[in-house]
Amino acid sequence: MASRSAGSLITHNNVTYIPPALMPGYRGHIPSASFTYGDTYGNTSARCFQDFRSTVLNSSRSPYCQGGQFPTSHSNDPALVIGHRSRGWDRFLHSPSWSRYNVDFKRSDELKQFHRAAEQHRDHYRDKSGTAHQVPHFIVPVKNPQTFPLPQQVL
């Protein structure tokens, strides 16, 4: 068996040969992509998917015939670029607004009140002036000896 230290490798350049056991990354199988020594499985698969996205976007055919539209960091279509998507509360504007008829109204009202209390709690933490009041729902109770110590425990 040949080894690197023996110098018995038959390659074009012994310095650049990397044995398969020392190659970085997972060497999985992508049917349409050939594996090279310098690329990891993640880089090869990302390149494969990006090439597919680019060919679909540049063609005049429907993108739904081969799998659809995928969000990516590099694309010809600005709507598919991940950085273009909204990151704030605006992302809920396009969510469906329908409601089911078998809703537990008491539970939904309880969740709405909890959401309001959570917003007030966030405002309390963001407030640097100390004018926002603390929400009593989120105050963690402590044991009585911690808040009112006995005179013997103070010393």
UniProtKB/Swiss-Prot annotation:
Q: What is this protein called?
A: Ciliary microtubule inner protein 2C
The family annotation for this protein states: Belongs to the CIMIP2 family.
- The primary location reported for this protein is cytoplasm
Query: InterPro entries recorded for this chain?
Result: CIMIP2C, CMI2A-C-like_dom
Functional summary from the UniProt entry: Microtubule inner protein (MIP) part of the dynein-decorated doublet microtubules (DMTs) in cilia axoneme, which is required for motile cilia beating.
The cellular location(s) given in this protein's UniProt record come to: Cytoplasm, Cytoskeleton, Cilium axoneme
Q: Which GO terms describe its cellular component?
A: axonemal microtubule
Gene name of this polypeptide: cimip2cb
Q: Name one Pfam family in it.
A: CMI2B-like
Is this entry keyworded DNA repair? no
Q: Which domain of life is it from?
A: Eukaryota
Coiled coil start-end: none
